[in-house]
Amino acid sequence: AVRETAHAAAPLLRPDTLLVTAAKGIERDTHLRMSQILEQETGGAFPIAALSGPSHAEEVGRGLPTGCVAASVSQAAALTVQDAFMNDRFRVYTSPDIVGVELSGALKNVVALACGICDGMGYQDNTKALLMTRAMVELCHLGERLGGDRQTFGGLAGMGDLIVTCTSMHSRNRRAGILLGQGKSVGQTLAETGGVVEGYYAAASMHQLAEKTGVEMPICRCVYEILYRQRPVQEVAR
């Protein structure tokens, strides 16, 4: 939808437009990040920023304190986004690492599926802490190989977003993982979760990127095998 929307909007943009993406994902066939899609569809004529972080809309809408990162290769663009969105309830930090911010926002959904599977199988806090920490190491390795900064993955847009997505019942990806852990099939899980389970699609992209770059990602590979190779959850857990 991002590509189609950007394509339709491109002829309407004024020369002084700043493009901001709040969508978290990787395009399935091309493995492009959202800002790269915007750049393609608008001819690279506009500055682009990504706004990302642990920001479930349910809580933002209620005015609960929230923090995000505005990332752009253009410091002026990042500062403009910060100024536009920040208030006493919504803190915005800036970063030049749009690659790391976008990758961490997209790939953490795969880890949320894994944590949900743990919940569904009855595992508790120790197991999830182990899973989240080691999975973040995997994301760091892939992110660095793709041009991101390791420090970004340990910050608000990385570890912060990972924590909220892996622990909140607002998270569709975690809810989907719980159903898988309880023994539901992939088809049943996607139907019952409601809405788009981003981690389902991100798992395929992550698997392909890991193979292409030669990065070992055993935890994320297990999620991929459950989703796309029908590997039993109980077998993977062993």
Where are these regions (language model features)?
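Internal alpha-helical scaffold of NAD(P)-dependent oxidoreductase catalytic cores
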Residues: 5, 12, 37-47, 65-152
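Generic structural signal for well-ordered, non-membrane alpha-helical segments
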Residues: 2, 27, 31, 35, ...
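Glycine-rich beta-alpha junction loops
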Residues: 24-26, 52-56, 74, 96-100, ...
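General beta-strand structural signal in soluble alpha/beta enzymes
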Residues: 21, 46-52, 92-96, 154-155, ...
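NAD(P)-dependent Rossmann-like dehydrogenase/reductase catalytic/cofactor-binding core
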Residues: 108, 115-119, 123, 144-154, ...
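Rossmann-like NAD(P)(H) cofactor-binding subdomain of soluble oxidoreductases
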Residues: 1-65, 81
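Active-site-adjacent beta-strand anchor residues
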Residues: 50, 71, 226
